[in-house]
Amino acid sequence: MASSSSSFPSSSISSTSKWTYDVFLSFSGEDTRNTATDFIYYALVEKGINTFKDNQKLEKGKTIKPKLLRAIKESKFAIVILSENYAFSTWCLDELVEIIDCETKKEITVFPIFYNVDPSDVRKQIGTFSLVKHEKHFKEKVETWKAALSHVADLAGYHVKN
């Protein structure tokens, strides 16, 4: 990650900018909150990069909070840390849809990190990225989630095996 830090601003975005945050971190807290996500977060903050990281545990079945949607829209970059449990979280999937929507409108630049997962599993929605587990309760959202996962898997990113 250190080699990519030059892609980010060296200091926080000015108050006249439309961005409140330099970077928005999207991650599954279950697998990465205290490991990869914290490492990335503190490395960015140490470089003076204003980074949004949601610190709350998310309740199952709750919809994505307006605060998070606003933080995505107010960020210049998004780092999406795709890990083993990412697709188990409907919250993460909803967040990803919003990030990809902003990316396709050229409002945000997305950097995926495939953390202990194969990018082709994300692209094809197989293994832990299969959305079959969600089809019964979230049928209306599954196709949108699949499209977002395929899109993020096609972006240039980092494949990290720990």
Model regions: which residues?
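Cross-kingdom TIR/SEFIR domain
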Residues: 42-46, 51, 57, 64-162
